[in-house]
């Protein structure tokens, strides 16, 4: 879920903290990517038609591999250096949110059965996507693929977004890529949305800067975290009836969550029983992340050509010629990206962002083409 309504809230109340950039402007940048979010999107859109998905001869889904392979090559060709961060064990406080997601998938499965009986194509498409879940096998497949491509993988001890934010704060990467806004709540200095969107969407990258958010909202980081918890996060229920704008007013008026309940109209607003907002706050401020330099030895290397052929072609039915051509693209791209950005050699100049007006762009509001990508493989699975 991320932080409910945060994009709109920032667009309306902290517009200078957001700017639109071209995809190509991130040449030479190292970026940390929330892997699970990307895999989820690939499973939803890549090669999908109704309930049909790309598979290998064993009937195993390969949409995530095709999406990860082609999208990562696009990043490399643009001179971008990706680091994929995978989720570890979720915090106990997230169990309630995960249970809700499980229930929603179960409901969608029932709705899908009804849609299949009535042959309603629109409902089949809609409910089929709602049943998607990223599994351990999907994650393991993508880790293996990325390592064979020479792209670094970080396995977070807990939340991937928290680890991404830690990498960014440590200066290991320029920014964090995800679609969930809680990367900002974890304190990621720079947060990027839409960088992983397909080129066919032609949506600019939206860059958020947490320092400017705090400046425009006139808040401390602690107050921003409280604002996000009040707005609605994955770790605890919010106060019923309070949305982002009301949460903003309350934090500005009272300073922290501690001072809010006693000043609320209890008839109008319902405070959850056993509300663990303090534990949620602690998870945002002190998440479980890797900080040891030895464990974060992030390096990009040459692709393992033989390994990629074995994994993609022999094991997963990808087209050999397309994979071979894709490998050549990776090699050319890595030579290109080694040139680096100019500021690596010269003193950087200021690049002030231009404030933008509020412009909400729904995630996944356009269907990705079902045509096979250049390194595609597999067949449809019903």
From Swiss-Prot:
Belongs to the XPG/RAD2 endonuclease family. FEN1 subfamily. DNA binds at residues 71, 159, 232, 234. Residues 338-346 are annotated as: Interaction with PCNA. GO terms for biological process: base-excision repair; DNA replication, removal of RNA primer. It holds the Pfam family XPG_I. Residues 372-382 have a biased composition (Basic residues). The keyword Repeat does not apply. It is found in: Nucleus, Nucleolus; Nucleus, Nucleoplasm; Mitochondrion. It comes from Glycine max. Mg(2+) 1 binds at residues 34, 87, 159, 161. It comes from the Eukaryota. Signal peptide: none annotated. The gene is FEN1. One of its GO terms (cellular component) is mitochondrion. This is Flap endonuclease 1.
């Amino acid at each position: 879920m991320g932080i409910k309504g945060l994009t709109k809230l920032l667009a309306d109340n902290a517009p200078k903290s957001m700017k639109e950039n071209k995809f190509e402007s991130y040449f030479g940048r190292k970026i940390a990517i929330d892997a699970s979010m990307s895999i989820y999107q690939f499973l939803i859109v890549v090669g999908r038609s109704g309930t049909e998905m790309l598979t290998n001869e064993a009937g195993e889904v390969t949409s995530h591999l095709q999406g990860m392979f082609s999208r990562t090559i696009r990043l490399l060709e643009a001179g971008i250096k990706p680091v994929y961060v995978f989720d570890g064990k979720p915090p106990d406080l997230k169990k309630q949110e995960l249970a809700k997601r499980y229930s929603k998938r179960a409901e969608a499965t029932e709705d899908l059965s009804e849609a299949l009986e009535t042959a309603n194509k629109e409902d089949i498409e809609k409910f089929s996507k709602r049943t998607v879940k990223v599994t351990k096998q999907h994650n393991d497949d993508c880790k293996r693929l990325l390592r064979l491509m020479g792209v670094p993988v970080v396995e977070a001890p807990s939340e991937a977004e928290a680890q991404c934010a830690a990498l960014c704060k440590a200066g290991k990467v320029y920014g964090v890529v995800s679609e969930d806004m809680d990367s900002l709540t974890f304190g990621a200095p720079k947060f990027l949305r839409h960088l992983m969107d397909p080129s066919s969407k032609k949506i600019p990258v939206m860059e958020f800067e947490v320092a400017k958010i705090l400046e425009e909202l006139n808040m401390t980081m602690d107050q921003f975290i409280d604002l996000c918890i009040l707005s609605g996060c994955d770790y605890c229920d919010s106060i019923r009836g309070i949305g982002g704008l009301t949460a903003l007013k309350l934090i500005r008026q009272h300073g922290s969550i501690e001072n809010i309940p006693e000043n609320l109209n209890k008839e109008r607003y319902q405070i959850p029983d056993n509300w663990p907002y303090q534990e949620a706050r602690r998870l945002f401020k002190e998440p479980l992340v890797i900080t040891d330099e030895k464990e974060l030895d992030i390096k990009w290397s040459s692709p393992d050509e033989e390994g990629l052929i074995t994994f993609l072609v022999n094991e997963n039915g990808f087209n050999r010629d397309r994979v071979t051509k894709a490998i050549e693209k990776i090699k050319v791209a890595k030579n290109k990206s080694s040139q680096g950005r100019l500021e690596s050699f010269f003193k950087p100049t200021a690049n002030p962002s231009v404030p933008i007006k509020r412009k909400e762009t729904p995630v996944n509001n356009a269907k990705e083409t079902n045509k096979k990508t250049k390194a595609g493989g597999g067949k449809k699975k019903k």
